[in-house]
Curated annotation (Swiss-Prot):
Belongs to the mitochondrion-specific ribosomal protein mS38 family. This is Small ribosomal subunit protein mS38. CDD domains: At5g63150_CTD (cd23699). The lineage of its organism: Eukaryota, Fungi, Dikarya, Ascomycota, Taphrinomycotina. It is a peripheral membrane protein. Coiled coil: none annotated. One of its GO terms (cellular component) is matrix side of mitochondrial inner membrane. Keywords: Membrane, Mitochondrion, Mitochondrion inner membrane, mRNA processing, Ribonucleoprotein, Ribosomal protein.
Length: 175
């Protein structure tokens, strides 16, 4: 008499699934029909970023304005404000660079902190590549092998162990 195995009994209970055609995970994120048919969660696609884009973002991260949604509204100046603004013109202005959709926006700020003007400028890809190459070449790389790191760690451990032993010996000898 042949007996049915436990695995085949479990598989008989699973009517909706087919073991001969498993669903690859990339189909779940690609088509919503597969996810709804088999009641599986969908996964958003991954957008891969090149190292050049990361270098650009890191470079311009320090030059972003404090508020990205800051809107400059011109104000009507009175005579006293005009005289103050003439004094401010003698002082040096600060410029803040921001990058949006491939355009570099240079905003000049007066000493009081108000935005005086914004100038968009398109930067060519050749200039971007030069900036990225310069940033990447400046960044120091610490190429220490795993074997060397382990050796340094063990030497440090042995040195500390020897110091502790010597300190304990001095303490016992009464020095």
């Amino acid at each position: 008499m042949l007996r049915r195995g436990a695995l085949s009994t479990i598989l008989k209970g699973l009517n909706g699934l087919s073991l001969r055609s498993p669903i690859p995970i990339w189909h779940v994120s690609a088509s919503p029909e597969v996810g709804s048919k088999y009641n599986l969660p969908t996964v958003p696609t991954t957008s891969h970023v090149s190292y050049r884009q990361i270098a650009k973002a890191n470079f311009f991260a320090g030059y972003r304005p404090l508020s990205a949604n800051q809107i400059c509204v011109p104000k009507v100046e009175s005579k006293t404000q005009v005289s103050q603004s003439q004094d401010e013109e003698d002082q040096p202005q600060e410029y803040v660079l921001s990058l949006e959709d491939g355009y570099l926006y240079a905003q000049s700020f007066s000493a009081s902190g108000s935005v005086t003007q914004t100038q968009p400028a398109r930067i060519s890809t050749q200039v971007w590549e030069q900036i990225c190459d310069k940033l990447i070449s400046i960044t120091p790389l610490d190429l220490t092998s795993v074997k060397r790191k382990r050796k340094l760690k063990m030497n440090k451990h042995k040195f500390k162990k020897r110091l502790r032993r010597q300190r304990a010996l001095r303490k016992r000898l009464g020095k």
